[in-house]
Amino acid sequence: MNNKFLIASALCMNLGATVNAQNPIIQTQLTADPAPMVDGDTLYVYTGHDEDGADFFWMNEWRVYSTTDMVNWTDYGSPLDLSSFSWADDRAWAAQTIKRNGKYYWYICAHSKLSGGIAIGVAVSDSPTGPFKDALGKPLFDNGQWDNIDPTVWIDDDGQAYLYWGNPHLYYAKLNDGMISLKGGVDPKEAIDDKRQVGRIHMTVDGFGAPDVENRDSTVKYKDNYTEGPWFMKRGKNYYMLYAAGG
């Protein structure tokens, strides 16, 4: 993309609350990858769920919690799991929900039975707490690679929605207005496919703490280099990205 991003690294995201709140805010489930969404006067937090006793990132479902005061939380259980996607069979990892035109779109990543890689899918609902259903009946993006993780979506002021994801590379795509298909038209210098549906944002030390992975010096210890979990926002004329960093 041609925009100049101001980058902020986030080693972790703490959705704790006021001095009266009890931390961790979720104590009855092993949750990961909190993704906040504000709708009206309510904050919703969408999470993954680590299985008890697992020795890897064994995760089969996503969960939803909400609060109106940052102290008291409501647990809505799991309105979305791997069985919601006929093409998925493992690794219900980091995901995000966003509202548009009265509907709620939950962008997820999971292991694909179709390709053997990690694929990105999208579920839709009329309510922020579900029920959600697979919007496509197939992955939104699936190229057989493992690095299609941590999808997030951001909508610019002009209404164009963007999908971001990736580890250790940072990928993006434009979404159509319906939010469930790729629009194409990414910068040809960044496109990774002939249809120009998906682009890769190239990294620099100034922008991301390190150059692209293939250009890194194994003898250099880079600081705060991009790893995964890209979250975009805009304030004034500047675009910001927060991400999970490794050093």
Model regions: which residues?
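Carbohydrate-active catalytic/glycan-binding domains of CAZyme proteins
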Residues: N20-G247
